[in-house]
Design a protein with these regions (language model features):
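C-terminal segment of classical bacterial N-terminal signal peptides
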Residues: 20-30
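Flexible, glycine-rich phosphate/dinucleotide-binding loops
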Residues: 21, 67, 176
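Exported/periplasmic cell-wall-interacting domains
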Residues: 44, 64, 78-79, 94-95, ...
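Bacterial N-terminal signal peptides that target proteins for export
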Residues: 2-14
Length: 198
């Protein structure tokens, strides 16, 4: 009877194991873990942050073909971005102000703050890599363009990163060399462009 509840059977088990071996597991498999060291030869120098949108993962390049991999939430289809930028500022317990200017600023360090425990500010206006109290959004296309991380993961990443660190977002690993030679370029989310124009 227990086998009937799981309609996948042996075929599903084999497919699941193959998917884990080939793709390195699904986005949800890491939701409770800190960064995981993996083999990832993406062709970028150590210290680079690479976001692979279709995997919903962020890689911190450690060097020698290795990276620290974190599950993340990326922008929704309308706000998904690709390109190369860099970390322009870093804050512990950052305050959050609504993008549209309406509403009060939420002070840093409280559990309901949408930016979580740490924020890495990117050179593109309003874009950040930050923590979140919305753990269920990790592994999804759920944000307005920011990259959300579990609070424990962004705290760990914060200690590895420095201001000026390159940040590259690509749609898939096939695009790994697309932004290697460019400084700041790519497609920003619509709201970030609007904010830059103000």
């Amino acid at each position: 009877m227990a086998a009937r509840r799981n309609s996948w059977g042996w075929r599903g088990l084999v497919l699941a194991l193959l998917g884990t071996a080939v793709l390195g597991g699904g986005p949800g498999d890491e939701a409770a873990a800190k960064g995981r060291a993996v083999r990832a030869d993406l062709g970028y120098p150590p210290g680079t942050i690479v976001i692979v949108n279709n995997e919903r993962r962020l890689y911190f390049i450690a060097g020698e073909g290795r990276a620290i991999r974190y599950p993340v939430a990326v922008g929704t289809r309308r706000e998904l971005w690709v390109g190369r930028t860099f970390v322009s500022n870093m804050r512990k317990n950052p305050p959050w102000t609504p993008v549209d200017g309406g509403g009060a600023t939420v002070r840093g360090g409280i559990p309901s703050n949408p930016l979580g425990k740490r924020a890495l500010y990117l050179d593109w206006s309003l874009l950040r890599i930050h923590g979140t109290p919305s753990r269920g959004s990790i592994g999804r296309a759920a944000s307005n363009g920011c990259i959300r991380m579990l609070n424990e993961d962004v705290i760990e990443l914060y200690e590895r990163v420095h201001i000026g660190a390159p940040v590259i977002a690509i749609n898939s690993r096939r695009e790994a060399d697309r932004f290697a030679a460019k400084r700041v370029t790519g497609k920003q989310p619509a709201y970030a462009k609007r904010a830059s124009a103000r």
